[in-house]
Structure formats: C-alpha cells, structure tokens
Amino acid sequence: MKISGNMSKYNKKISFFEILSQIPSNREDWYIFECDAVGKAPNNLTMSEFEDLVLNSKYGYQMSWDELLKFSKEIEDINNLIVVSSTSPVEFEMIEKGAEALQVRVEIYDSTTWEIEFYG
C-alpha cells in the first residue's frame, strides 16, 4: 500500500514528524539511506557530517523508531530523504527491488512530495 502527498498544505510546510505520524508506532530498525536536510543531526554531528555518514553507510544509518521520531523533530527542512524499516539490514539496491526484509519505505523528493510504501 502506498500513500503520498505534497510537502506543503494550506501554504504551510509539512514536517518530517508529521509524515512519520502516518506510520504506526513500532519496534523495527530504521535505516536512513539518503538525507539532504536542514536541522540538527544526531550524535552531535554537523548535518554535513551526518549526510556524508549516511551516504557512506553500506546498510544505511540505523536508528530505532524512537530515535527516528526524535531526529524528525529536529529537522527544519528536507530536500531529499530515503528511510526504510527492515527486519534485517539491506543494501540500497535491494530497496529498489523491494527486498523481502523491507516493511516500510519513506521517501521525500525535492522538498515537494513525500511517499510512504508499506510492504507485506
């Protein structure tokens, strides 16, 4: 099942946290594969350092659901983002193919649209 929308509603920008609020609370591991954003990065990293770390992580940058929600509240604006929940670590290429381990995929494109896909 897929749901999607625009990043602005009634001339107001939708936050990353608001997008995540469409996903039921869970205990899954989440992996960030792309992050081009403005805001506060986790673990006292600069956003530039965090973006580089994410891009250079074979299996994405791992977070719990609670960590992802906390991170989402620190983000002011997102240009591009790809984050997935998965029962086991997956490589980026497997996201494109829809690996069996995938449970949810969240993408934000060019600061304009977002999409959530639920697998299984």
Language-model segments: residues:
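Short cationic amphipathic helices and targeting signals
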Residues: 112-118
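N-terminal interaction modules that seed assembly of large macromolecular complexes
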Residues: 6-59
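Surface-exposed, low-hydrophobicity interaction/linker segments
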Residues: 45-106
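Ser/Thr/Pro-rich, acidic low-complexity intrinsically disordered regulatory segments
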Residues: 1-3
